Amino acid sequence: MGAFSEKQESLVKSSWEAFKQNVPHHSAVFYTLILEKAPAAQNMFSFLSNGVDPNNPKLKAHAEKVFKMTVDSAVQLRAKGEVVLADPTLGSVHVQKGVLDPHFLVVKEALLKTFKEAVGDKWNDELGNAWEVAYDELAAAIKKAMGSA
């Protein structure tokens, strides 16, 4: 992978700030998009047993965790050119939940669409690409950890 630029890191961080302005709403959008593409994914998340509820603190917390890990990936890519998982159990958790390769694509699409909505007219290809690279590298690190789980 090529170098992750300072500008890419800045784009990810600034759009993360936009997301944080309305976490419950954006979290609900994120999981709604996931379930539209992969309805069976509802069974992978205990907090979705009653559907997508923006007032559910577990839904909000998990969405924030996914997005924050992607932001952290951008920071790591800029600083050292690779992503190292802060939580070594992520691989085994994903294996236990039955996560397969196509699920990562569904999550990526939902993440990008959620951020597109969060930033509105500030969205552009450069911003989308920065998030895409950060997420792809995070997903690769999780998949690697899944292989050794």
Swiss-Prot record:
Modification Nitrated tyrosine, positions: Y31, Y135
Primary localisation category: cytoplasm
Residues modified as Phosphoserine: S46
GO biological process, one term: nodulation
Presence of the UniProt keyword Glycosyltransferase in the record: no
Intracellular or extracellular location(s): Cytoplasm, Cytosol; Nucleus
GO CC field: cytosol; nucleus
Modification note: Nitrated in effective nodules and particularly in hypoxic conditions; this mechanism may play a protective role in the symbiosis by buffering toxic peroxynitrite NO(2)(-). Nitration level decrease during nodule senescence. Phosphorylation at Ser-46 disrupts the molecular environment of its porphyrin ring oxygen binding pocket, thus leading to a reduced oxygen consumption and to the delivery of oxygen O(2) to symbiosomes.
UniProt keywords, alphabetically: Cytoplasm, Heme, Iron, Metal-binding, Nitration, Nitrogen fixation, Nodulation, Nucleus, Oxygen transport, Phosphoprotein, Transport
Expression across tissues: Root nodules.
InterPro entries: Globin, Globin-like_sf, Globin/Proto, Leghaemoglobin-like, Leghaemoglobin_Fe_BS
Protein's UniProt keywords contain Phosphoprotein: yes
Binding locations of heme b: S46, K65, H94, K97
SUPFAM superfamilies: Globin-like (SSF46458)
Function: Leghemoglobin that reversibly binds oxygen O(2) through a pentacoordinated heme iron. In root nodules, facilitates the diffusion of oxygen to the bacteroids while preventing the bacterial nitrogenase from being inactivated by buffering dioxygen, nitric oxide and carbon monoxide, and promoting the formation of reactive oxygen species (ROS, e.g. H(2)O(2)). This role is essential for symbiotic nitrogen fixation (SNF).
Subunit structure as annotated in this protein's UniProt entry: Monomer.
Family recorded in the similarity comment: Belongs to the plant globin family.
Name of the protein in its database record: Leghemoglobin
Organism: Canavalia lineata (Beach bean)
